[in-house]
């Protein structure tokens, strides 16, 4: 560690946000919220919009810690974590390996399966294969295997004659995953403990707008589900956090088909840098267990280190 975060009463924090991924707007919102909370907690916070000159700016600023509020590619996939390790600047959230692994949905699911966690059937297919025929019986979901925030996600409903026309900016290889009907559940893990289960209620598909537009979804916490399903979500989220090697906070998303009871539960993905916007799930879950937003942000900073 180049600088000892714990030895300073109020470390100088670089709030790294923005970046160039498709999730830039979400990242800016998270960064602004966290920056304001940390300033209220007495920290010196410097806003840092990550761009091509990031390494030089970090060397000039010489922060005691980097709060990584980036989302999506480059900021959440191990790339910027590697830069911070190289510069020996303590940083928040997961390290290089866990970030890269969790960002790759196919490898994440392989890690889940190896740990005995329940998953939905899925595979990687080219755009040409998807366009030519159904690669699995509908309903199924098409999504990039290395993006978050439901960017570029398509739901192919039961009875559809063909897959939808895909946006030109999507990659050539995509994940296709069997759609699990029912409810969307999610669990935040802080350190090594699960906080609670939230049931995400929407009018339709839980897409980008449902996640980030006020009123786009309703969050019920604690989720009103059977006790064995609730306990399984909590335990599975902790296991996912551990087997992926996550640090700090993570959030694991599930689908649950109530018709199949506990057998209807499937892990979708683990987010190593959960959103911290006004409509985000992780701050709500922390508040539910008595940890206010400012205290959560403080904990994240105090947890920062190198060699994560």
UniProtKB/Swiss-Prot annotation:
Which UniProt key words apply to this protein?
ATP-binding, Cell shape, Cell wall biogenesis/degradation, Cytoplasm, Ligase, Magnesium, Manganese, Metal-binding, Nucleotide-binding, Peptidoglycan synthesis
Pathway, per record: Cell wall biogenesis; peptidoglycan biosynthesis
Location in the cell: Cytoplasm
HAMAP family in UniProt? Dala_Dala_lig (MF_00047)
Where is the chain membrane-spanning?
Answer: none
Q: Where does Mg(2+) 1 bind?
A: 253, 269
A single GO BP: peptidoglycan biosynthetic process
The family classification in the record reads:
Belongs to the D-alanine--D-alanine ligase family.
UniProt keyword annotation of Manganese present: yes
Q: Which SUPFAM superfamilies match?
A: Glutathione synthetase ATP-binding domain-like, PreATP-grasp domain
Q: What is the recorded function of this protein according to its Swiss-Prot or TrEMBL entry?
A: Cell wall formation.
Question: Where, by residue number, does Mg(2+) 2 bind?
Answer: 269, 271
EC number(s) per UniProt?
6.3.2.4
Catalysed reaction(s) here are: 2 D-alanine + ATP = D-alanyl-D-alanine + ADP + phosphate + H(+)
Residues bound to ATP are 136-186
Per the record, the domain of life is: Bacteria
Q: Which gene encodes it?
A: ddl
Source organism phylogeny: Bacteria, Pseudomonadati, Pseudomonadota, Alphaproteobacteria, Rhodobacterales
Sorted alphabetically, which InterPro entries does this protein's record hold? ATP-grasp (IPR011761), ATP_grasp_subdomain_1 (IPR013815), D-Ala_lig_Van_CS (IPR000291), D_ala_D_ala (IPR005905), Dala_Dala_lig_C (IPR011095), Dala_Dala_lig_N (IPR011127), PreATP-grasp_dom_sf (IPR016185)
Q: What is this protein called?
A: D-alanine--D-alanine ligase
Species per Swiss-Prot/TrEMBL record: Dinoroseobacter shibae (strain DSM 16493 / NCIMB 14021 / DFL 12)
Q: Which GO terms describe its cellular component?
A: cytoplasm
